């Protein structure tokens, strides 16, 4: 029986090298999404060399399923591309794709008159953790934990949290106003639940949370 193994983040960097590869009898293909340093890919190739199987590093270029409309496809982050691929694979329709991770990306997929799917691009905002880190480094804030989103806020933690989440809401509202009101919104990433909880009612009903959207996109290359 063929099986797929999906490893992510620190699992790949720290623990994957400790797996007893002798227990794996056959590898037909390895598909890698790497947004950091090439050292990760080099280590992976070194550990898998005796399997003599192709190692495919996903790049953000057009394929038969989805056309990348970016002016320079090579500059599109592979995580954004895979989220779009995963969204299209699951739903196959016009939609907004929000990936809330280190950065928050709000992207658009549209089908043209020839029924071809296009990644139209979108916008990028600092993620919640990055925003907290920037404020902490610039203003010497002591507390960088997420607080309550409420206005007016009566303490710094809540005031910062309210500001960050309100900026994200504002960006999503802007996108929603520019596009058809019935367009589905796919929300993924580590902060998806937090953003969903703070969403406004007029577009909250359109949101579908897909926790493994990037991995769904990765499976398109298996």
Residue spans of the language-model regions?
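Internal, active-site/partner-interface "lid" segment
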Residues: 100-102, 155-156
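Short beta-strand scaffold segments in enzyme catalytic cores
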Residues: 1, 97-98, 104-110
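Short glycine-enriched loops at secondary-structure junctions
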Residues: 61, 102-103
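Nucleotide/phosphate-binding catalytic cleft detector across ATP-hydrolyzing
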Residues: 2-95, 116-222
């Amino acid at each position: 029986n063929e099986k797929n193994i999906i490893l992510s983040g620190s699992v790949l960097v720290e623990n994957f090298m400790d797996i007893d590869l002798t227990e794996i009898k056959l590898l037909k293909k390895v598909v890698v999404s790497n947004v950091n340093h090439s050292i990760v890919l080099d280590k992976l190739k070194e550990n898998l060399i005796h399997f003599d199987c192709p190692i495919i590093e996903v790049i953000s270029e057009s394929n038969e399923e989805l056309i990348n409309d970016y002016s320079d496809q090579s500059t599109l982050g592979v995580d954004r591309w895979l989220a779009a691929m995963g969204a299209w694979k699951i739903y196959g329709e016009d939609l907004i794709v929000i990936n809330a991770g280190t950065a928050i990306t709000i992207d658009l997929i549209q089908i043209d008159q020839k029924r071809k799917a296009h990644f139209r691009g979108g916008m990028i905002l600092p993620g919640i953790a990055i925003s907290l880190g920037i404020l902490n480094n610039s203003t010497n804030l002591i507390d960088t934990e997420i607080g309550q989103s409420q206005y007016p806020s009566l303490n710094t933690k809540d005031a910062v949290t309210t500001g960050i989440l309100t900026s994200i809401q504002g960006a999503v509202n802007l996108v929603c106003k520019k596009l058809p009101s019935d367009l589905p919104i796919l929300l993924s990433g580590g902060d998806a639940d937090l953003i969903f909880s703070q969403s406004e009612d007029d577009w909250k009903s359109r949101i579908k949370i897909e926790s493994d959207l990037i991995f769904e996109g990765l499976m398109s290359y298996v």
